[in-house]
From Swiss-Prot:
<dbReference type="Pfam" id="PF02556">
    <property type="entry name" value="SecB"/>
</dbReference>
<keyword id="KW-0143">Chaperone</keyword>
<keyword id="KW-0963">Cytoplasm</keyword>
<comment type="similarity">
    <text>Belongs to the SecB family.</text>
</comment>
<comment type="function">
    <text>One of the proteins required for the normal export of preproteins out of the cell cytoplasm. It is a molecular chaperone that binds to a subset of precursor proteins, maintaining them in a translocation-competent state. It also specifically binds to its receptor SecA.</text>
</comment>
<keyword id="KW-0653">Protein transport</keyword>
<keyword id="KW-0813">Transport</keyword>
<keyword id="KW-0811">Translocation</keyword>
<dbReference type="GO" id="GO:0006457">
    <property type="term" value="P:protein folding"/>
</dbReference>
<dbReference type="InterPro" id="IPR035958">
    <property type="entry name" value="SecB-like_sf"/>
</dbReference>
<dbReference type="GO" id="GO:0051262">
    <property type="term" value="P:protein tetramerization"/>
</dbReference>
<dbReference type="GO" id="GO:0005737">
    <property type="term" value="C:cytoplasm"/>
</dbReference>
<comment type="subunit">
    <text>Homotetramer, a dimer of dimers. One homotetramer interacts with 1 SecA dimer.</text>
</comment>
<dbReference type="GO" id="GO:0051082">
    <property type="term" value="F:unfolded protein binding"/>
</dbReference>
<dbReference type="GO" id="GO:0015031">
    <property type="term" value="P:protein transport"/>
</dbReference>
<dbReference type="InterPro" id="IPR003708">
    <property type="entry name" value="SecB"/>
</dbReference>
<protein>
    <recommendedName>
        <fullName>Protein-export protein SecB</fullName>
    </recommendedName>
</protein>
């Protein structure tokens, strides 16, 4: 007869997502309605992403914030500019503190990114454009690049 351990959540290392939320959202559509008529070609998209990590007052609780900005332009107009600060509160349970930086910089952003991506797609579509579907982001590669730049 086998025994099943039902106590796994209390002892196993895991990440708990306690909250997800929009901290700030801004969309500018400065050339409308003229820019909406000029959508015969695919716009140039300039995208920037930053991650902010804040240690909260309660032990092993962190806020991970994605800052995403996208600017779309064509030959004539700045079509739109969208800025989103989207965050999550994470509890790192039974995880060695040496692993916290990589988890907070890679795994936690990857968990909330699909929600931020959806918000940006919905907002740009509601502004009269094709939804901006941001490609998946390799947060691991970004983390390793940042670490190698920091060492140099």
């Amino acid at each position: 007869m086998s025994t099943i351990n039902t106590d796994t959540n209390e002892t196993m290392p895991h990440i708990s997502v306690n909250a997800q939320y929009i901290k700030d959202l801004s969309l500018e559509n400065p050339s409308a309605p003229s820019s909406l008529a000029a959508l015969d070609q695919r716009p140039q998209i300039d995208l920037s992403l930053d991650i902010n990590i804040t240690n909260l007052s309660e032990e092993n609780f962190y806020e991970v914030e994605l800052n995403i900005e996208a600017i779309a332009r064509n030959e004539k107009y700045k079509l739109f500019q969208i800025e989103l600060k989207y965050a999550g509160v994470f509890n790192l349970i039974n995880i060695d503190s040496e692993q916290h930086p990589v988890l907070l910089s890679v795994h936690c952003p990857a968990m909330i990114f699909p929600f931020a991506r959806k918000i940006i797609a919905s907002c740009t579509q509601d502004a009269g454009f094709q939804p901006l579907m941001i490609d998946p982001i390799d947060f691991g590669a970004l983390y390793h690049k940042k670490m190698s730049e920091h060492q140099n």
